[in-house]
């Protein structure tokens, strides 16, 4: 027997007096397959290579800017 995970979504509309509550149940294997499908799409093939390159470039610039700011305050003349 698979474990069931449930979710409750509550939304309230400003213009009307009705509240909407929806409940869904999703098994852990369905949720895992959804995440696996997304990760395979984003981490493999040409799109995966592009994501890794963009992530590396973004990480480089973050470290560069933090180092520049740190160096500015460390070597600042008083």
Curated annotation (Swiss-Prot):
Residues 1-48 are cytoplasmic. Residues 70-78 are extracellular. Pfam families: DUF4731 (PF15875). It is a single-pass type II membrane protein. GO terms for molecular function: protein homodimerization activity. The chain crosses the membrane at residues 49-69. The modification Phosphoserine is found at residues 6, 17, 22, 27. Residues 1-22 are annotated as: Disordered. The modification N-acetylmethionine is found at residue 1. The keyword Membrane applies. This is Small integral membrane protein 1.
């Amino acid at each position: 027997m698979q474990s069931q995970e449930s979710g409750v979504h509550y939304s309230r509309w400003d213009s009307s007096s009705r509240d909407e509550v929806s409940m869904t149940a999703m098994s852990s294997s369905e949720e895992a397959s959804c995440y696996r499908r997304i990760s395979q799409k984003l981490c493999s093939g040409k799109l995966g290579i592009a994501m890794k390159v963009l992530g590396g470039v973004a990480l480089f610039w973050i470290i560069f800017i933090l180092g520049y700011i740190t160096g500015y305050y460390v070597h600042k003349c008083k």
